[in-house]
């Protein structure tokens, strides 16, 4: 696939098996070279830290976009495209398709962060696996005094 979209929240929760390293490896195995996977992740709980760290364990290239109080992670199967290339494509698609939401405006919200730096993503966050995925517990523990840049 060129694109896989994951939006599996049921109320405030997401099924734990859709946030594990093994799940993301299966997703990656089904992506074409240069394909992307996008997933909505709520940033206000410790689950965000573990989810991002888990995604990054399979997809080392991640972009982040703000979306109505949530963060959409976009992970790449292969190298990321340059900012200039993405901007040119966004402008072309905006003009060609008259989309409801401007891709150029969304691209302006693009952020990249260092996963291992510990400044935004908690250095103690655990990678979620099929054998260890306390999703509901992490979802219920609020993150304090940190904001996504």
Model-found features: residue ranges?
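A short, flexible beta-alpha/helix-coil linker loop
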Residues: 9-12, 37
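Glycine/threonine-rich flexible loop motifs
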Residues: 12-19
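A short glycine-rich, Lys/Arg-flanked "PGG" loop and its adjoining helix->strand segment in the class I
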Residues: 19-33
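A short acidic, Gly/Pro-enriched loop at the edge of an enzyme's catalytic core
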Residues: 1-5
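Conserved beta-strand signature within the Rossmann-like core of class I S-adenosyl-L-methionine
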Residues: 34-41
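Conserved Class I S-adenosyl-L-methionine
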Residues: 24, 48-69
């Amino acid at each position: 696939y060129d694109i896989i979209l994951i939006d599996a929240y049921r109320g405030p929760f997401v099924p734990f098996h859709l946030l594990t390293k093994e799940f993301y490896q299966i997703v990656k195995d089904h992506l074409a070279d240069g394909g992307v996977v996008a997933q909505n992740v709520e940033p206000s709980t410790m689950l965000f830290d573990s989810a991002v760290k888990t995604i990054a364990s399979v997809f080392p290239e991640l972009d982040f976009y703000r979306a109505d109080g949530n963060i959409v992670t976009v992970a790449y199967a292969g190298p990321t495209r340059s900012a200039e290339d993405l901007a040119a494509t966004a402008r072309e698609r905006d003009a060609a398709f008259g989309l409801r939401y401007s891709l150029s405006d969304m691209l302006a919200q693009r952020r990249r962060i260092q996963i291992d730096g510990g400044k935004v993503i908690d250095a103690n966050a655990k990678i979620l696996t099929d054998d260890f995925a306390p999703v509901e517990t992490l979802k219920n523990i609020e993150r304090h005094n940190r904001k996504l840049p």
